[in-house]
């Protein structure tokens, strides 16, 4: 039993420990260090943003020319990382997020060619974690860099090492960092999912021979277990991030070969939501006793092609349908799959949620703000921020909105004054 001054000292120690535990969360709450934000769920938790802006749009802070690619920016501790292609080199640029000024550059040659004539730049959003930057290039090169200097720490040619095919549109899955491991859906015959040591790049474990998807994996506590959740080319793979052992799988993919799984899985308590296009649709899975069973499924609720839906208060907001055929924007009740509202012909895009506001970037380059409400859709504000085509995921960090097309990266101020 603790008594007297010992109790007081113990209480102070506990308070200090709590402060140390909470401090990192406070520091990173304003960051956007990876695809879909700090928790890979599309939710912004930084300083409040404006619910609307003037007809001319929010104030532009800076702009700069960039190379090819669909990889959106990542932002951490005031540093923005952009992964793009200039001529025949894949380039990682670190910039001051406040000014756009270059801090350092790392580059290496690439020979990637798109078989369908699309953009040939990198597709995967970089990850900033533990003082390092991790990039996954269109031709499969995985790099670990020092975030302060850009110094190359290690690199792995994942396609060669794990005998992975090129894929329909190149390599496009963002790495997942969990502690000392970097996990990637490599899609190789000798390693479908691979964990690398974050410091050295050495292989820690391999699991499955599933093909690579374009979906970003997530890590979460599910049914009391810390679990890495991948939506591979075949479907759901949930595994132990410590050793790669498979906990459960569920096949979910289109019947046609020329298709992709691209939306990130969404984990809510002990349930997992998956969505794909090409007539596949969505499924909500219940996890229990290291197994999964469907709660509901169907192609009539939310058919995500490339863009991931965002969950808010039990409702999914996202883009339904094939990108090239014209998409609708809709709201779906997660528990039932019921469509609450639908805006037909809205067009493709991406979205995130800040407080109760949908922050929508349309493929045309128009930014739209709207209430995140299942009661219906209405615009609060809309403005053209840059010319289309905009397919890269934007980043929202410390009230600044960073968005790129195939030629420029621009920063805008959305901070509520």
Give the residues covered by each predicted segment:
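Extracytoplasmic beta-rich repeat domains
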Residues: 61-74, 105-127, 155-177, 187-190, ...
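Short loop/turn segments immediately following the C-termini of beta-strands
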Residues: 37-40, 85-87, 138, 187-188, ...
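Structural recognition of the beta-propeller blade-terminating site
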Residues: 96, 146, 197, 240, ...
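Bacterial N-terminal signal peptides
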Residues: 11-25
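Short coil/turn segments that connect the beta-strands within blades of beta-propeller domains
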Residues: 77-78, 130-131, 179-180, 225-226, ...
């Amino acid at each position: 039993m603790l008594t007297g001054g010992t109790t007081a000292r113990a209480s102070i120690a506990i308070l200090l420990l709590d402060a140390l535990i909470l401090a990192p969360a406070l520091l990173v709450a304003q960051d956007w260090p990876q695809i879909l934000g700090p928790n890979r769920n599309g939710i912004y938790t930084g300083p409040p943003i404006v619910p609307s802006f003037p007809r001319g749009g929010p104030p532009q802070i800076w702009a700069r020319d960039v190379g090819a690619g669909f990889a959106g920016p990542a932002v951490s501790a005031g540093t923005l990382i952009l992964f793009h292609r200039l001529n025949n080199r894949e380039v990682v640029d670190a910039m001051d997020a406040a000014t756009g000024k270059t801090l350092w550059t790392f580059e290496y040659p690439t020979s990637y060619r798109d078989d369908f004539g699309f953009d040939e730049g990198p597709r995967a959003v970089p990850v900033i974690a533990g003082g390092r930057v991790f990039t996954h290039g269109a031709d499969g090169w995985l790099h670990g860099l020092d975030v302060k200097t850009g110094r190359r720490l290690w690199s792995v040619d994942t396609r060669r090492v794990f005998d992975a095919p090129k894929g329909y549109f190149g390599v496009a899955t963002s790495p997942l960092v969990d502690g000392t491991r970097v996990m990637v859906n490599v899609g190789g015959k000798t390693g479908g999912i691979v964990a690398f040591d974050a410091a050295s790049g050495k292989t820690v474990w391999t699991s499955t021979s599933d093909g690579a998807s374009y979906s970003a994996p997530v890590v979460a506590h599910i049914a009391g277990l810390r679990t890495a959740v991948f939506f591979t080319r075949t479907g759901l793979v949930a595994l132990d991030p410590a050793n790669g052992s498979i906990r459960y799988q569920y096949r979910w993919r289109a019947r046609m070969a020329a298709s992709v799984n691209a939306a990130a899985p969404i984990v809510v308590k002990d349930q997992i939501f998956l969505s794909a296009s090409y007539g596949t649709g969505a499924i909500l899975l219940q996890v229990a006793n290291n197994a999964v069973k469907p709660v509901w499924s169907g192609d009539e609720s939310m058919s995500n092609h490339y863009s991931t839906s965002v969950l808010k208060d039990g409702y999914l907001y996202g883009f339904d349908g094939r990108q090239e055929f014209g998409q609708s924007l809709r709201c779906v009740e997660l528990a039932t799959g019921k469509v609450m509202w639908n805006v037909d012909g809205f067009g493709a895009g991406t979205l995130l949620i800040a407080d109760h506001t949908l922050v929508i970037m349309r493929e045309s380059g128009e930014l739209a703000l709207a209430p995140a409400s299942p009661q219906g859709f209405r615009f609060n504000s809309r403005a053209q921020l840059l010319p289309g085509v905009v397919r890269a995921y934007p980043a929202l960090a410390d009230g600044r909105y960073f968005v790129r097309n195939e030629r420029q990266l621009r920063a805008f101020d959305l901070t509520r004054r």
